[in-house]
């Protein structure tokens, strides 16, 4: 099975192709260019390099969040469009799970974290045992102090991955000496991790439905928060 995967949930973007569980090829760009300009081009270039045509792809996947609202929308829209045009399965996977699948090099506890701004991180942690990934909590948005409370009773090394790894490490190391910061190249969101997460979903018997793929933002966008605050003020004014 050939899986084409998109990752555009943060600053970097990429595409990857997985062939029967083995990475066939991957592109990665961290130049700051707009994902809407680069993502499909990278996927097309990768398929040509691998001597594949769009009709050769058996399934498509995208990082469905959490992450940048715009980036997640671009990636999921690209995956859904590709799937609908070819009538193939489409999988939306957790950005956090994909990061751990792409970075885990040994058994242990992995804490995936993305900088969510406003003194928060998008976070989930996982255990890797005998090479198999086990989720320990749902994806969520946490303040750093809340993350500390959640991790403080773990008495094993905790490997940090994601673009929020350095933030968590620098903020919490004094209180959590078990923290371990993985090298920078392993902390980036990668399309290969998305492909591996999609392969795991397929192996588990999940059916990828493009119509059911929706972004998982975990919290409201800034525009939505501002609109809600405006509505609250208007309601308060009406009640005076």
Regions found by a protein language model. Give the residues of each.
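N-terminal beta-alpha supersecondary unit
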Residues: 1-64, 188
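Surface "functional belts" at beta-alpha junctions
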Residues: 22, 34, 89-188, 217, ...
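Stable alpha-helical structural segments in soluble proteins, enriched in small hydrophobic residues
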Residues: 46-50, 85, 103, 191-202
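Glycine-rich phosphate-binding loop signature in dinucleotide/nucleotide-binding domains
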Residues: 50-55, 106, 152-156, 202
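Acyltransferase
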Residues: 182-240
